[in-house]
């Protein structure tokens, strides 16, 4: 299987969007010439429109951000170029000890705590989001490759947790018991502060697979981060 994962992310402006499309044009050009037996694309849950109910693989792909537009466009480019089995994995927010992104959430909170800096939340951290362990994403990629699966699959646990709760969990695990503070919100909450998922398709596709709980994943990330330092 060929796994397509490279992207300049998160895509924040038109220039980044153009570069990401150009990147995929190079990939699809190569795939057109040499058709692999199986292609897996790592996309994003950002392709979905906001919803008050749990999102699933059949939910409307109507992105409200350039990041979502970028991934949806790249999905369509691959569908046009790949003649064999194509699997599209759409992870929600990913966390892990070695994750290179310092985005708002578990990764940033853990690094701030390690540096002895207070954790500043957006608003009071009341948004509730799903977070998936990077090892679970890797595990799903391996299963998809082994089974030569095709179609769309979300990578999301089905459990939402507020950012304040996540910050409290991180601090409880850390050596530095830093302060957690709210801050004035500078705009509307992303996704209206709530983005749940229905993980039923994962269980149907891979019955033996189970997602890591947030508590276990944060504990493992903390241990791995400490060992690396």
Model regions and ranges:
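Conserved Rossmann-fold NAD(P)-dependent oxidoreductase catalytic core, especially the SDR/UDP-sugar
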Residues: 25-66
């Amino acid at each position: 299987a060929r796994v397509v994962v490279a992207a300049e992310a998160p895509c924040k402006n038109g220039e980044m969007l153009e570069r990401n499309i150009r990147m995929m044009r190079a990939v699809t050009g190569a795939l057109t010439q040499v058709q692999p037996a199986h292609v897996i694309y790592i996309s994003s849950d950002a392709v979905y429109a906001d919803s008050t109910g749990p999102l699933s693989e059949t939910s409307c792909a109507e992105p409200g951000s350039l990041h979502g537009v970028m991934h949806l466009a790249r999905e369509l480019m691959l569908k046009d170029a790949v003649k064999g089995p194509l699997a599209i994995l759409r992870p929600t927010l990913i966390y892990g000890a070695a994750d290179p992104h310092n985005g708002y959430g578990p990764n940033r909170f853990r690094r701030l705590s390690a540096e002895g800096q207070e954790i500043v939340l957006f608003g009071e951290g009341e948004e509730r989001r799903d977070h998936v362990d990077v090892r679970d994403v890797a595990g799903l990629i391996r299963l998809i490759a082994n089974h030569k699966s095709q179609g769309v699959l979300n990578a999301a646990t089905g459990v939402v947790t507020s950012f304040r709760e996540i910050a409290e969990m991180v601090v409880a695990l850390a050596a530095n018991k830093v302060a957690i503070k709210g801050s004035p919100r500078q705009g509307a909450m992303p996704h209206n502060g709530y983005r749940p998922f229905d993980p039923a398709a994962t269980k149907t596709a891979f019955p033996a697979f189970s997602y890591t709980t947030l508590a276990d994943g944060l504990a493992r990330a903390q241990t791995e981060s400490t060992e690396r330092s």
